[in-house]
A protein has these predicted regions:
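Acidic, Mg2+-coordinating active-site environments of NTP-dependent enzymes
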Residues: 1-108
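Catalytic cores of large soluble enzymes that bind and process phosphate-bearing ligands
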Residues: 57-60, 74-78, 114, 145, ...
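Conserved phosphate-donor/acceptor-positioning beta-strand/loop module used by diverse small-molecule
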Residues: 1, 111, 167
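Hydrophobic, well-ordered secondary-structure elements that form the walls
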Residues: 96, 111, 164
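Generic detector of well-ordered alpha-helical packing
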Residues: 65, 112, 169-170
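Active-site beta-alpha connecting loops in nucleotide-dependent enzymes
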Residues: 92, 116-119, 124-171
């Protein structure tokens, strides 16, 4: 959906489009391997292979990281300098942010997902990252706004989580 819309805009306005992942993309992702709490991303840029390590979680954060590399490279930064720095990027507070580890080695994440789509994305990203894990979710939909989303978010939580701790306000 997004791609068709962007293709139409870029063609109509004669803009140059940069993308990743596909055959004729600026960056082609060759492999993503999970090693402990890190990802090793192998990609191709201008017929050269590069490797990047990151602790970011989730498809959106990885996409943003790749587009940051593209933007930096298009700004004439050398790829070796980009790769020296890019691995230091951490998640934005409140966006699939790892905030702890329990005695049983369970990981604790914080995300301020406030829409049904955002909640589902977070749950799916964590499930992809830790496919064998049971997800326990603490969430609330406080305030007087947008009461219609509460049952939808509750349904998503009950469908995809092992345990739910529902609060009467934002936890």
């Amino acid at each position: 959906k997004e791609t068709k819309f962007l293709n139409k805009i870029t063609k109509h306005r004669k803009l140059i489009k940069y993308s990743y992942g596909k055959k004729n993309s600026y960056i082609k992702i060759l492999d993503i391997k999970k090693i402990n709490d890190e990802k090793k991303i192998t990609f191709k840029l201008k017929n050269k292979i590069y490797v990047l390590k990151t602790s970011l979680i989730g498809e959106i954060q990885i996409k943003n990281l790749i587009f940051a590399i593209i933007a930096a490279h298009l700004s004439r930064l050398k790829i070796k300098d980009i790769l020296k720095t890019i691995h230091k990027i951490k998640t934005i507070p409140g966006r699939i942010q790892k905030i702890g580890k329990l005695k049983n080695k369970s990981k604790v994440f914080l995300d301020y997902a406030h829409t049904p789509d955002a909640l589902k994305t977070v749950i799916f990203d964590i499930k992809k990252e830790y496919p064998l894990a049971d997800i326990s979710l603490v969430f609330g939909c406080g305030g007087e706004r947008d009461k219609k989303k509460r049952p939808i978010m509750g349904s998503i939580a009950s469908k995809f989580c092992h345990k739910i701790y529902l609060t009467d306000d934002n936890p």
